Amino acid sequence: MWTPELAILRGFPTEAERQQWKQEGVVGSESGSFLQLLLEGNYEAIFLNSMTQNIFNSTTTAEEKIDSYLEKQVVTFLDYSTDLDTTERQQLIFLLGVSSLQLFVQSNWTGPPVDLHPQDFLSSVLFQQFSEVKGLDAFVLSLLTLDGESIYSLTSKPILLLLARIILVNVRHKLTAIQSLPWWTLRCVNIHQHLLEERSPLLFTLAENCIDQVMKLQNLFVDDSGRYLAIQFHLECAYVFLYYYEYRKAKDQLDIAKDISQLQIDLTGALGKRTRFQENYVAQLILDVRREGDVLSNCEFTPAPTPQEHLTKNLELNDDTILNDIKLADCEQFQMPDLCAEEIAIILGICTNFQKNNPVHTLTEVELLAFTSCLLSQPKFWAIQTSALILRTKLEKGSTRRVERAMRQTQALADQFEDKTTSVLERLKIFYCCQVPPHWAIQRQLASLLFELGCTSSALQIFEKLEMWEDVVICYERAGQHGKAEEILRQELEKKETPSLYCLLGDVLGDHSCYDKAWELSRYRSARAQRSKALLHLRNKEFQECVECFERSVKINPMQLGVWFSLGCAYLALEDYQGSAKAFQRCVTLEPDNAEAWNNLSTSYIRLKQKVKAFRTLQEALKCNYEHWQIWENYILTSTDVGEFSEAIKAYHRLLDLRDKYKDVQVLKILVRAVIDGMTDRSGDVATGLKGKLQELFGRVTSRVTNDGEIWRLYAHVYGNGQSEKPDENEKAFQCLSKAYKCDTQSNCWEKDITSFKEVVQRALGLAHVAIKCSKNKSSSQEAVQMLSSVRLNLRGLLSKAKQLFTDVATGEMSRELADDITAMDTLVTELQDLSNQFRNQY
């Protein structure tokens, strides 16, 4: 490995490394001068260096494409230059590639603005085909388009990213002397991805390859220096995986970084005060950070903290009630250790992962604010401070007492880009271990906040300056100025026709011809054009055309999560369940935590009669969203279908948690039959063993739903319907049947219909027989008499109603249909009376 590679990755050399370079003669070489400028953060000087000028000032034709020219010049220098040896040529080109990337990041992410122009280091012949620099930028942006996804139109100095990509990606196979190159390729890929509208499968594949290559570098992560770099690498990998929906892999990478650092990070409760006038300390949620070891004690390998005056100021809340920070009752108990850059970055990474894996909810916001409070309590690094403040402003904008600070803080974050007091070297410390958004994204956040607060004109001013026409259109549309939105887009199209502008015009007008024009302009490569056209078909319920457009879009870029989901829905509408299953399968592959996609996938499997697959997919859906009652309802039905009776009981309990009066009599019938008949479940176990759990479930159900006779009868059935050998079970069955009878007789019109009347009579007779059996096991004769008397009264009431309602007025005779029932009731009333008398004689 070339000696300075670790320092370049780290962003600074140690004193020992400086001495080693002097001894090895690194400093005096051509690459040594580049190295010194790079480590000083003087990236522009590298491009103004005579060596760089010589590489790129070769003869060319005006017709030659700029990317071809740049790559040709780099390859020519690497292969044919005789002034330097092969290794040093590779080192120079590598340093040029890293400088290009760093300068591009400075120009678009960190600031301050870059003064370098392409004309400063490239041949003037290259610019003859462009009337102005904007024309060159637009052409370069088109070269950086991938998988049909365009790049933000006002990206600054895109030529720098193009050059970085040529060196770190296209010709990386020629830089064999640089072992750490795959890591820089990964960084270049990550920066490129964040400029695209959607995730690029090409970039993700390249990122995965880079990660694998870095993992194989044995000597990169050894000794104390390697430990710090290992943490940085695993954090960078975690952010890559998070962005591409690989949440499990991201968590694994974060866990590795945390294990290396030996940090213990926990959300916990502590007594404290939040308001100025609070008298008592109450439990507050805080982040407790502790070191379990001292593995990161060698501070020469970690970046030195930036002076606070050079960091974005953490603005005060200035509220007359709420304190700026929680005032803890015992500050020393939760005293946080003095953390290094990598340790703070781990906390930020865990916070970001937590945010991605939890629903938007008040509790989640409170937990995230505990993370931001912790991060901001040790202001040391520009990238971490900026990331934490951006997250806090997003969390605070919904609070009436905090929105004013959120507004001021976002403005301060937007303004810091132009501020030249903080050097780029300070801003780039630990930069790649954080997800700092580009500076225009912060300005967009400011404009969005202004719009939400009702400052529409100020928001529009920022959006128009940023040329974020989609946001401009949304502003006008929400303000009801539909004509103005169309006017703005047509004005921009007169200046230059682009696929994205035609797509936006199509969104405003709902006109397919606009999307067709965008598709044509993109040379049939715009995933956005087909995506937008499909969505219009979807709104118009033209599902067949919708499916065709979505399929074209995902063929260009298969990483469009939202498109796969909408495609699945369109296939469901067409009743093409094979198609919907395929689409939702791709959805959950991209985002394994998408509960709705899992649920819809199970629906597709159910329609395809693949019930076991449906059951498994619903299990995955519930892992993602435990609160979604519709998923639980699908789960309970599928569980009973496939014979997972234990899971069905568990699901019924959960539905009772989520919906207080939930009932599904059909499911309860299946469960009762399974338990009583001793059916085998999917695993081959006999369901009789679930009797206790089913009784417990019925106890909960009947405590919530008290007026359903069918449920009470099923409950009695679980206890043997009064025919059990256990007296206590017969007693319980009698109680359930009594309540069922009460529900039956309280319902409307049962006595006016002879069929319904006969059903009630049969239930009353059955209840009477159970009462007779139970009475014989009563220890108290008085209780036995009460039981028999209640059922005898039921029968007498029915006899009375029968005579009243079903006697022929002309003949005075009872309906023949009830003759047997009347006889049975009369006989049973007599038997009950005799048995009651026997018990009375025992008093």
Curated annotation (Swiss-Prot):
- What SMART domains does UniProt report for this protein, alphabetically? TPR
Q: Where are the TPR repeats?
A: 453-486, 492-525, 527-560, 561-594, 596-628, 629-662
Q: Does the keyword tRNA processing apply?
A: no
Q: Which family does it belong to?
A: Belongs to the TTC27 family.
Q: Which Pfam families match?
A: TPR_16
Indicate what this protein is called per its UniProt record.
Answer: Tetratricopeptide repeat protein 27
Please provide the record's keywords in A-Z order: Repeat, TPR repeat
PROSITE patterns, alphabetized: TPR, TPR_REGION
Disulphide bridges? none
Repeat in keyword set: yes
Which InterPro entries does UniProt cross-reference here? TPR-like_helical_dom_sf, TPR_rpt, TTC27/Emw1
